[in-house]
Structure formats: C-alpha cells, structure tokens
C-alpha cells in the first residue's frame, strides 16, 4: 500500500510521508551519477526511471488530493460566512475572510511543502534523463572507436 492510501485515510501521516520522500530523494540523487561500468548503468536505467517516476506520480496524486481537500475546506468556510455573517458580504469579501482562516492557511502551507518535494523529484527525473543521454553518447563514442572514454 502506498503513501496516497495512507494519507487519504489519515492526513496526520503527511510529515512521515514528506520525510520518506526526502530520504528517497537522497538515494535517487545518488542514482543520477554516472560512474562505473557503462553497460551496467545502461541496463539499470529503465528500472531506476520506472521506480522514481512512480514515486513522482504518487507525490503528484497526494498533492492533488491535498488540493481537493483544500477546496472542500474553503467551501465549508465560504458557506459559513455567507450563511452566518450578520451583514451581507460580497463573494470577494468572503474569499478574503476564508483566505485568513487558520485551517486554510495551514493547509496551504502543507500543500506548499509537498509541492516543494514534488519539484525536487522533477529535478531528479530530469537528471535521470540527462544520465540516459550521457550513456547514449558514451556508447556512440565507443562504437566510433574511442574506447578510452572514461567517466
């Protein structure tokens, strides 16, 4: 079972999920380095990319879930202000009040933190793409006769 299922059942597991993905990020960054046997690196690339891309997709799904929950929370506050406030408020006024609610602000901070984790993972996927490009070029150089190309 993945982190998406855990968080959708219990939102309090977000800090643990962030810590997990940060730890995985450190390992993923090590996988971005091109050292050692080129053939071995080339053989491992599809599995590495698949694993890390799946992790990125899980982060994206969690982020989407958090945004859905934020919209639900904002909607409940919006409704509260429209129905229970003493004077008539414009939609813009209500929006400003909702944006200032502590729960809404806290949720936006959580979403921002998860978005940062997602952006770091996007960087890892770009680095893995570059690694694949480098492997391809080293192989082409070897085919062209430059056997002494080292990493």
What is the meaning of each model-derived region?
Residues 66-110:
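Extended, amphipathic alpha-helical coiled-coil scaffold segments used for oligomerization/tethering
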Residues 142-151:
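Acidic, low-complexity, intrinsically disordered peripheral segments
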């Amino acid at each position: 079972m993945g982190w998406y299922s855990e968080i959708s059942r219990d939102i309090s597991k977000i800090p643990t999920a962030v810590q997990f993905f940060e730890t995985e990020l450190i390992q993923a960054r090590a996988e971005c380095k091109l050292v050692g046997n080129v053939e071995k690196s080339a053989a491992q690339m599809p599995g590495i990319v698949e694993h890390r891309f799946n992790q990125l997709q899980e982060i994206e799904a969690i982020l989407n879930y958090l945004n859905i929950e934020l919209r639900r929370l904002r909607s409940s506050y919006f409704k509260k202000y429209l129905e229970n406030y003493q004077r008539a408020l414009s939609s813009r006024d209500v929006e400003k009040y909702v944006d200032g609610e502590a729960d809404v602000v806290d949720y936006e901070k959580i979403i921002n933190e998860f978005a940062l984790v997602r952006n770091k993972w996007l960087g890892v996927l770009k680095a893995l793409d570059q690694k694949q490009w480098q492997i391809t070029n080293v192989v082409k150089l070897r085919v062209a006769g430059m056997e002494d190309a080292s990493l």
